[in-house]
């Protein structure tokens, strides 16, 4: 006799935007393309890995002095220290004053999971979390599961085809006092110092708690310090915040899920209290973070020669990416595609907006088998010499068919 399953009332989970990749994989068209990978891609269409990572991984594997014991709850301390110095600079006053610290976490989502758990417990009167559109899928569910009400916002001006600080100001002016604001990819927002100063003034006056996300330091401008100077400015003025610092993409260690949850506090005393609470949550969530990726990164960051090699590899990725953007813009110009495409090269970072309408995106997906999100925000490293002509010709056709 068949017994009833204890899982009989469990439904299939609601489909996420991530199903775009599933649809792509089910497409039998031989020349299909996917332009929404999260990782950096090589010219050959494979995930990019810094060459210095390969070398360092082998050295660590052959080191007989290393043990494989559990790490402390806080994680690998040398990794945390070197990561903080990478983020804020070796001579940071905040580091010297010991008012910034971190917890070694499991992947970028681990930072949001840990941070959300803390905020749920210690900011019980706060229910609103505002998340930038391109990150809602990634961390929105985490906050929802914690009982927060999640609002989505965008700072991309679809009319002017640029990041618009006035849209950011409007978001800040309308969200409730004390809300949590997830600020993603600040390295890709080309705001001026004065614009950031105005934004920070509103954040402080409304007691908004910022939760920054730094997923790929160095892959925006090719300059590690330039990519985080706004974060350094914020911490220099005593702003308290959390920050998810992921080091998976800029080292090419995607399967390791390497990063830290950074805490910036007013004083060392406040910092230590927060870290102690976070470590309690760590014990319940994962107990022990992965060590191999952290050891690879620490070895590179603490060795001047290896660090120099790694920086050069980042510059190589950024230079290649900038060249791809220039080629896409030029090919669209030569095809006579209506509209200006200057916004493609004005954007920094691996990901950027093509500035297409939903109708044009739908044409690319259904008629050309080119898969990209409805927002037309793509990973430019997915474009290479083998597919650029097909992609630009398809964009041209999409625009021409929907023009007017």
Curated annotation (Swiss-Prot):
Necessary cofactors: pyridoxal 5'-phosphate
Gene Ontology terms describing biological process: amino acid metabolic process; biosynthetic process
Lineage: Eukaryota, Metazoa, Chordata, Craniata, Vertebrata
Species this protein is from: Mus musculus
Protein name: Putative aspartate aminotransferase, cytoplasmic 2
This protein's UniProt keywords: Aminotransferase, Cytoplasm, Pyridoxal phosphate, Transferase
E.C. code: 2.6.1.1
Molecular functions per Gene Ontology: L-aspartate:2-oxoglutarate aminotransferase activity; pyridoxal phosphate binding
UniProt-listed Pfam families: Aminotran_1_2
Record family assignment: Belongs to the class-I pyridoxal-phosphate-dependent aminotransferase family.
GO CC terms: cytoplasm
Catalysis performed (reactions): L-aspartate + 2-oxoglutarate = oxaloacetate + L-glutamate
Gene: Got1l1
């Amino acid at each position: 006799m068949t017994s009833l399953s204890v899982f009989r009332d469990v439904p299939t989970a609601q489909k996420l935007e991530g199903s775009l990749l599933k649809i792509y994989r089910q497409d039998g068209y031989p020349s299909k393309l996917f332009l929404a990978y999260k990782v950096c891609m090589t010219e050959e269409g494979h995930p990019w890995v810094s060459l210095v990572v390969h070398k360092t991984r082998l050295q660590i594997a052959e080191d007989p002095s290393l043990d494989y014991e559990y790490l402390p709850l806080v994680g690998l301390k040398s990794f945390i220290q070197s990561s903080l110095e990478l983020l804020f600079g070796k001579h940071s006053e905040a580091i010297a004053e010991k008012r910034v610290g971190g917890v070694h976490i499991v992947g970028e989502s681990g930072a949001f999971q840990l941070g959300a758990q803390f905020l749920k417990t210690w900011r019980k009167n706060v229910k609103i979390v505002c998340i930038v559109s391109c990150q809602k899928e990634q961390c929105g569910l985490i906050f929802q599961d914690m009982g927060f009400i999640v609002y989505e916002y965008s700072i991309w001006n679809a009319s002017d085809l640029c990041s618009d600080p006035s849209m950011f100001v409007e978001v800040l002016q309308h969200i409730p006092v004390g809300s949590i604001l997830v600020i993603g990819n600040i390295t890709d927002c080309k705001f001026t110092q004065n614009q950031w100063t105005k934004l920070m003034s509103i954040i402080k006056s409304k007691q908004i708690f910022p939760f920054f996300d730094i997923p790929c330091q160095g892959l925006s401008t090719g300059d590690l310090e330039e990519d985080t100077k706004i974060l350094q400015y914020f911490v220099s003025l005593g702003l308290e915040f959390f920050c998810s610092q992921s080091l998976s993409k800029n080292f090419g260690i995607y399967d390791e899920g390497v990063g830290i949850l950074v805490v910036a506090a007013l004083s060392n005393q406040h910092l230590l209290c927060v870290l102690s609470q976070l470590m309690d949550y760590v014990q319940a969530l994962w107990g022990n973070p992965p060590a191999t990726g952290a050891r690879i990164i620490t070895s590179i960051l603490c060795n001047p020669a290896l660090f120099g090699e790694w920086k050069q590899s980042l510059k190589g990725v950024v230079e290649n990416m900038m060249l791809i953007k220039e080629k896409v813009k030029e090919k669209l110009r030569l095809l006579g595609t209506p509209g200006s495409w200057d916004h493609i090269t004005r954007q920094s970072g691996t990901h950027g907006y093509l500035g297409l309408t939903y109708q044009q995106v739908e044409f690319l997906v259904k008629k050309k088998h080119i898969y990209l999100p409805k927002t037309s925000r793509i990973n430019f490293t997915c474009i290479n010499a083998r597919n650029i002509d097909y992609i630009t010709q398809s964009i041209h056709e999409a625009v021409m068919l929907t023009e007017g």
